[in-house]
Amino acid sequence: MHYFIRHELLKHATLSALRLFSMIHPGDRILVHLSGGKSSMALLHCLHAYQEILQRENPDPGGKGVFDMGAVVVALAYENYDLLPLVNYLKALGVTHYYEKQDMNHYCSHSLDLCSSLKQKVIYNVARRYGYTVLALAQNLDEMAASFLSSVFNNGSIQTMEANVELKDLNLRLIRPLAFCREKTIAEFVKTAGLPVMKTACPICEQSRVEQVRLKEILAAEENNNPHLFSSIISAISPLLHLSSQSDIVLESDTTSQTKVITWTKPEN
């Protein structure tokens, strides 16, 4: 039995988001980006367990109503940065997986934008090459809330990351099944389940998360005064999570002083 089934908070939050935003359809082929962080490991197990739920609800030998799932691990080549343990873990789970290594030595400069762009291109190429129709990313409610605050504080706008959005010209949908999951709930689940977690080895990416950490500290301080803060935040941002059904942008986590808007573009053939 998956730990997901026995963790009621995580189960309820994930199923609520999956069903409210109609994230998964019969016959979908879903590609999970597995970074090795807590959220991506939790996402992998949540979707793996959700497959079993659908199989019980739809005991059709033909498999109708059940989706296919694979995972992609993107390793940017830094010294002492080895994500191969994730591959071994995926093998043990029996999850279809793809290990893609990107050499960084050809680039004269290094930035967060470069890391994001390279990963996105690799992930898209894997999805296209193997026929996946949905990309699953692991941003959680705390990150959604921080993104919302950043857009208000820094850009004078009201926006956050969308939960289920079609990517124009890519024949893909992007979903965020952990949109209603608290970071602390995910951390508790990962610890209880004993899931392997790997920290990024990219120093620039780590430094660029300072702004997001600051915003999360603001939220934590306010939550001490208002225990229902995140329930209110869910009500406030839910309309933004499915504001548009068509988009050619992806709002990624706030890792700089401004909300990052990353454009997904087709890589050259």
Segments predicted by a language model, with ranges:
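ATP-dependent adenylation/nucleotidyltransferase module used to activate substrates
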Residues: 1-150, 154, 184-192, 267
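Mobile, glycine- and charge-enriched loop segments
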Residues: 98-110, 172, 243-259
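Residue-level detector of flexible, active-site-proximal loop/helix-junction positions
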Residues: 78, 104-106, 165, 181, ...
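The feature marks non-catalytic terminal segments
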Residues: 195-269
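Short, basic, helix/turn surface patches
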Residues: 117-131, 164-169, 218-237
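Electropositive phosphate-/nucleotide-binding environments in soluble metabolic enzymes
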Residues: 4, 8, 117, 180, ...
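Catalytic subdomain that performs nucleotidyl-dependent activation
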Residues: 63-69, 142-221
